[in-house]
From Swiss-Prot:
CDD domains: HisRS-like_core, HisRS_anticodon. Its main location: cytoplasm. Signal peptide: none annotated. The gene is hisS. This is Histidine--tRNA ligase. The keyword ATP-binding applies. GO terms for cellular component: cytoplasm. One of its GO terms (molecular function) is histidine-tRNA ligase activity. Homodimer. It is an enzyme of class 6 (ligase). It comes from the Bacteria. Pfam families: HGTP_anticodon, tRNA-synt_His.
Length: 424
């Protein structure tokens, strides 16, 4: 039996990888424009980082982490998210001692043991940004505007930004008390997970996808009902700034997010029709997280987006479109001497920066031209023993179906000129 890839993972093959590369280039471009710098953290961390940072009551820590003991008997976890790692790096490398704010972004794989379904994988990829060192509403508005701008450039349609304030340690206890009082008469009807959340973190019950729990929480007190003056003013200013930036948003009082570290601002970006999950970005403010992982009190805000979901949404928005040709020129060589000469030509063109290819299988003229079509090459250059003897080469435009004979000595100059005229 052939060995297969682990469940919940995927092979990104040629033709698909190019879509990922394009998305990554768009991400890096907009991050440069907004003044964010890339950070790369380890794929595995000490398990305690996520227990303390993400929260021991979360589904991620309780059910979804890939955790193991290494050969030194240390508990290690493959990172399930990026924010805790960035905060750890911020503290460990004393970034808090330099100019603030620190504006960072990351791109990389994350790991969660989830039931694989449409839009969800056990190894998945996230792009995220984190801003540390400033607590102003304008920073919240900037990170939301960044992702809104990115999705607009990617051509995504039917987008919705949902925003909420989940309060702070000063005002959240009052909401917790009111929510527990509301849920207490039907506590035993809650799902098993929500019953365990009732005492420690009842706010998470509002995030439960169980239909019974959703029905029970209809009409429950929201965090907006009990915000302190500071949180209320922060949320009001955020909405004003989003409107000024022409970001279309909706206040969603039931939005609480699934991680314990959020304070004040929480937000999601949703899109329709990409499978089981419609959220393609989520984030919020985490002013206590840096201190939780051993640093000084430091405000922070960020978001993460699932790149697989964004690519799926982009595919739906654009439809099935043919990508750019993998090769600009395919050299069709027939015969040993022609293959040697053709290989030398292709090598010189590649060194100058032209995407060029040559058949490696010694196939027939017909088979090589079919291969050139498959990679959507713009041109095929045909060189056989007869052409070599005459000192010519045939250049065929595969887009127009036209061809010309060129002196072999002039070929590279001519094809390079056409390459530049095509905007390369």
């Amino acid at each position: 039996m052939a060995i297969q890839r682990p469940k919940g993972t995927q092979d990104l093959l040629p033709g698909v990888v190019e879509q990922w590369q394009d998305l990554e280039e768009q991400i890096r471009k907009i991050c440069r424009e907004y003044g964010y710098q890339e950070i790369r953290t380890p794929i595995f961390e000490a398990t305690e980082l996520f227990q303390r940072g993400v929260g021991e009551t979360t589904d991620i820590v309780n059910k979804e982490m890939y955790t193991f003991l290494d050969k030194g008997d240390r508990s290690i976890t493959l990172r399930p998210e990026g924010t805790a790692s960035v905060c750890r790096a911020y503290v460990e490398n004393k970034l808090h001692g330099g100019p603030q704010p620190v504006k960072l972004y990351y791109i990389g794989p994350m790991f969660r043991y989830e039931r694989p379904q449409s839009g969800r994988f056990r190894q998945f990829h996230q792009f995220g940004v984190e801003v540390l060192g400033v607590d102003k509403p304008m920073v919240d508005a900037e990170v939301i505007t960044l992702v809104w701008d990115l999705y607009s450039r990617l051509g995504l349609k039917g987008l919705e930004v949902h925003v909420n304030s989940v309060g702070c340690p000063s005002c959240r206890p009052e909401h917790k008390k009111k929510l527990q009082e509301f849920l207490a008469p039907r506590q035993e009807q809650l799902c098993k997970d929500c019953q365990s959340r009732f005492e420690k973190n009842p706010l998470r019950i509002l995030d439960c996808k169980n239909p019974t729990c959703q029905e029970i929480t209809q009409g429950a007190p929201t965090t907006l009902d009990t915000l302190c003056e500071e949180c209320a003013e922060h949320f009001k200013e955020l909405q004003s700034l989003l409107s000024a930036a022409e970001v279309v948003y909706k206040v969603n009082p039931r939005l609480v997010r699934g991680l314990d570290y959020y304070r004040k601002t929480a937000f999601e970006v949703l899109v329709e029709d990409i499978g089981a999950q419609s959220a393609i970005c989520g984030g919020g403010r985490y002013d206590g997280l840096v201190q939780e992982v051993g640093g000084p009190p430091t405000p922070g805000i960020g978001f993460a987006m699932g790149m697989e979901r964004v690519l799926a949404a982009r595919k739906l928005a654009q439809g099935e479109q043919e990508g750019e040709g993998k090769e600009y020129l395919m050299l069709v060589a027939l015969g040993d001497q022609a293959q040697r000469e053709g290989f030398a030509i292709v090598s010189r063109l590649r060194k100058q920066g032209m995407p060029a290819g040559i058949d490696l299988l010694g196939r027939s003229l017909k088979a090589q031209l079919k291969a050139a079509d498959r990679v959507q090459a713009h041109y095929a250059a045909i060189l056989g023993e007869e052409e070599l003897h005459k000192g010519i080469i045939i250049l065929r435009d595969l887009r127009l179906g036209e061809q010309v004979e060129l002196p072999l000595q002039d070929f590279e100059e001519v094809v390079w000129k056409r390459y530049k005229e095509d905007g390369n």
